[in-house]
Amino acid sequence: MSKHEILVQSVVDAIGDNEFQVGDKLPSINIMVRDVGYARKTIVKAYEELKDRGLVESKNKQGYFVISQETGVVLRVALLLFAFQSFQEDFYNTLREELGKKFQVDVFFHHNNISIFETMITNIKGKYGMYVIAPIQDDAVKPMLQTIAPNKLILVDRYLDLGPEYSFIAQEFENATYSTLVKLLPDIKKYKSMVLFFNSKTDYSPIGIRRAYERFLKDHGIKGSIEENYISGTIKKDTLYFIKNDSILWTFLKDCNQGHCVLGKDLGILSYDDNVLKEIIMGGITTISTNFKEMAKIAAKYVMDGNEIRTIIPTNLISRSSL
């Protein structure tokens, strides 16, 4: 074992034996240099590794303090998502499965709210060895994220340009949505009109989806509109509904069922972000989706080996009977 590894293990053992408890201060770097005889950079490296494991945190000008006695954990990972929607649950479960028990994953949600996002970053910064974050696509959050070292951060789901040194695994929304709508043009033309339910404040929808939809309507002469919310009981036949928000989708499907509407015949439904319910409910819902489990596997690999990754996950059309 190297000197810093010996020091790390000594502190881990001391924490495990309750010699250090949560809230206790570790000996200062200067004291450790004097008493142990190791170089200052060796002590700093050891304390920083203990930070990465989530066992200690550094307080400015005060020193290093014990914050956890979970000594079996190799690395604490902060996962910051939009909300616990079904597809993000798939991401979370896969990430945890891939990392295994030696990695502690703590999940947080920002709900597409910049103020909440800032509070979350402030609260978790410096307390985790790795950060997996689905960012709000707004320039205002860039400085917040750039306070985290590039080798400890990976952006997932949404793309935000933090610079060439930062890793990401993201979806691309505008061109992917547009090309999928073009692919579906023969099916879309079966309907008299099209409605997109889009509300970026409540369903966290990226603006690229709306832009793609508007461009598609214009380019192909399709009659269509955009609604922020669905009002129960307002279903119209011979209409294709493009629904991003799953809460709206479930209410809409309930009304369809009560009104004895046949999907793909009386009206059509196109959704976003696939899950097992959309596969089986009412004969299946046609969905535009990326593979969130694959995204999580790539993110887990980054957490474990730290090799830089900058990639866009393909978006796929999953055709079912709802069109």
Where in this protein do the model-derived segments appear?
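Flexible loop/turn connectors
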Residues: S247-L323
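Extreme N-terminal segment that seeds HTH/winged-HTH DNA-binding domains in transcriptional regulators
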Residues: M1-D35, R310
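Amphipathic helical "hinge" segments at domain boundaries
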Residues: I29, Y64-T122, Y128
